[in-house]
């Protein structure tokens, strides 16, 4: 782990990291988030009886779109040409929650961690948005990077 912030320059100002001289490598990141809800809300999603339609399909598309828009949301992120974005949603009735996982890939000069985290986060937010009429006290939690590959810092896995 580095003890320097790469997005802070010598003057202490935020800046976008210059990746011009970095090598193009295969890069991949996986992230997850959870959204906890009442059993009845989760059952409504799982049974497909939600009045707004297929909650998981909508959240999946929202997560994919969010990964592609990460540089518009996070000021110092580079715009990336993603080659793969995958968002999976898993109902976990035993915990009364949904687990969201994301995978982002590309061949490029900078990593895709923020894209993976954004995909998982926005998918969770979309579930909240679609279900808030039924339940307002849902909890989004444990958003984290699970794994990253490629680049100078190498492989990281939780």
Swiss-Prot record:
Reaction equation(s) it catalyzes: (8S)-3',8-cyclo-7,8-dihydroguanosine 5'-triphosphate = cyclic pyranopterin phosphate + diphosphate
Active site: 129
Entries under SUPFAM superfamilies matching the protein: Molybdenum cofactor biosynthesis protein C, MoaC (SSF55040)
Pfam families linked: MoaC
UniProtKB keywords: Lyase, Molybdenum cofactor biosynthesis
Subunit structure: Homohexamer; trimer of dimers.
PANTHER family associated with the record: MOLYBDENUM COFACTOR BIOSYNTHESIS PROTEIN 1 (PTHR22960:SF0), MOLYBDOPTERIN COFACTOR SYNTHESIS PROTEIN A (PTHR22960)
NCBIfam families: moaC, PRK09364.1
Name of the protein this chain belongs to: Cyclic pyranopterin monophosphate synthase
Species of the source: Shewanella woodyi (strain ATCC 51908 / MS32)
Taxonomic path: Bacteria, Pseudomonadati, Pseudomonadota, Gammaproteobacteria, Alteromonadales
Annotated gene: moaC
